[in-house]
Design a protein with these regions (language model features):
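Acidic, low-complexity/disordered tracts enriched in E/D and polar residues
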Residues: 1-35
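Conserved alpha-helical substructure of the radical SAM core
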Residues: 56-203, 207-208
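Short acidic, hydrophobic short linear motifs in intrinsically disordered regions
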Residues: 38-51
């Protein structure tokens, strides 16, 4: 399968299954578009009719171009065969290990964001803080079910996890003890709205957390429309100085500013640029997840605006990078020179199998977006996964699980997409959230274009960087530990 598009002055041709990316002139671009359905003579005639007035386009040149396209096809760089379908289901049929937990240490929050999918941190239930005993058992559950995998991921989540900070500190200390006993390496992430950040929190996170996610929606007027406290007061002025101090002290350790855009700020690139101008360089901005009847929900009329915004973002990122003011956007982070192995590219995020959410009471759900839905209760941290039917349903979420995905050029980049988004949009985790698909494909086009621009600049300096699909390391297939 081949996908062609034009963006920022580049004619880009992507071969889906090999991962090869070709940057060509307009003549070759048109030749490739005609190649599958037309003879060489038909292509030559059409190209001469379109470009015949140009002295650099002759029949000899066109036939050489067609020969070059044929050579690329024969060498698996264009219209390469799809050999991954069987691998997708074989991979999911293996014995799984649990590698990550989203630990809901607080079903309570000190903000009252109106668009919150978690019902202001309560997940449509009671307010609660996780006890140390439950947290400890959750870590034991993770260790017991992680097999030979060494690196284990734990995200302290809520609600607002810093409302249970003392328990978090105690639990991390426990995990550090268990690392030595079981030859494991815990990597912690803290996701916070920032209200309770102080020097103690900063020092702890910079010592113990592999990553931190800091919630900010961008411009003050945008952030304070939704991210308010229980009295309706905006949070921007309270949290931005804390975030700036946090990031300053964090040095070169991982962090992300994580925002949400809605129908009310479809010009969300201005919020990203605002955060960059505040000094933040690791940025993410997500489309809102809410009921379609909610006034903040994105509409069909918003879609072309959002696509244009992603293009504006990509072009500005290239510009700022050249000026020495570059920043990272999470959804444009792709590695075309190697990247994830094929098993990771055809399987989904691992929700419900390798990744689960744990409530303050110890219940297990496929991920944080399913918490509170009795249909998707997997079990608990004492008895393990008892609802094997749900686990098996999630096992078969992959890039080939949906008929619509099998013919999509982006399937090896999205791995089948988000099961929760599909469920909330269609009522089934194997449904297709078409709106999200459109946004994802535009993000991938922009991300690839940025890589093309980077490679063009390197090529101008005499540095060649091949672009190809991630290889198969076999670690996942063999059940071995990997990153």
């Amino acid at each position: 399968m081949v996908h062609q598009y034009q963006l920022n002055g580049y004619n880009i041709v992507l071969d889906t299954c090999s991962g090869s990316v070709h940057v060509v002139d307009e003549v070759a671009y048109d030749v490739i578009a005609m190649y599958p359905e037309h003879t060489a003579d038909e292509i030559v005639a059409a190209m001469l009719a379109k470009y015949g007035s140009r002295p650099d386009v002759t029949e000899e040149d066109l036939r050489q171009c067609i020969d070059d396209v044929t050579s690329l096809k024969e060498n698996g760089k264009l219209w390469s065969p799809d050999v991954y379908k069987d691998m997708a289901f074989d991979f999911k049929n293996r014995n799984t290990v649990v590698k990550a937990l989203c630990l809901h240490v607080a079903h309570s929050c000190n903000l009252s964001c109106s668009y919150c999918f978690a019902s202001q941190g309560r997940y449509h239930g009671d307010r609660a803080l996780m006890s140390f005993e439950v947290g400890k058992r959750a870590m034991d559950f993770l260790i017991e079910n992680s097999g030979t995998r060494r690196n284990l991921e734990v995200d302290f989540f809520g609600g607002e996890p810093l409302m249970n900070f003392d328990m978090v500190k105690k639990l991390v200390a426990y995990c550090r003890e268990q690392e030595k006993i079981h030859n494991k390496n815990f990597r912690f992430t803290m996701t916070t709205n920032g209200v309770l950040i102080d020097d103690d929190v900063i020092d702890f996170c910079n010592k113990e957390c592999h990553n931190v996610v800091l919630s900010l929606d961008g411009r003050k007027e945008v952030n304070d429309r939704f991210r308010v406290d229980c009295a309706g007061n905006g949070s921007y002025d309270r949290i931005v100085p804390k975030f700036q101090e946090f990031v300053k002290k964090r040095g070169d350790k991982n962090y992300y500013m994580r925002g949400t855009y809605t129908h009310y700020n479809t010009d969300f690139t201005n919020d990203i640029f605002h955060m960059a101008d505040l000094g933040f360089t690791e940025l993410s901005m997500e489309p809102v997840v809410c009921d379609p009847s909610d006034p903040s929900a994105l509409t069909e009329a918003d879609l072309p605006i959002l696509k244009e915004q992603y293009e504006i973002l990509a072009k500005e990122m290239i510009k700022r990078d050249r000026e020495g003011r570059g920043f990272t956007f999470y959804h444009y982070m792709i590695d075309l020179t190697g990247g994830p192995c094929i098993y990771k590219r055809i399987s989904d995020c691992g929700s419900g199998t390798e990744y689960m959410a744990v409530t303050p009471w110890g219940d297990l759900y496929p991920c944080h977006q399913f918490v509170g839905d009795p249909k998707y209760l997997l079990g608990d941290i004492w008895k393990g996964v008892t609802n094997t039917a749900v686990r098996d349903e999630f096992k078969h979420c992959n890039a080939y699980a949906r008929k619509e995905c099998q013919d999509c050029w982006a399937k090896l980049y999205c791995s089948g997409g988000c099961a929760a988004n599909s469920y909330h949009a269609t009522g089934s985790i194997t449904g297709v959230y078409e709106y999200g698909c459109e946004l994802f494909k535009k993000r991938m086009e922009c991300a690839i274009m940025i890589k093309v621009a980077e490679n063009q600049e390197l090529a101008a300096k005499g540095i060649e960087v091949p672009i190809e699909l991630g290889s198969t390391c076999n670690a996942c297939a063999d059940g071995e530990a990997c990153e």
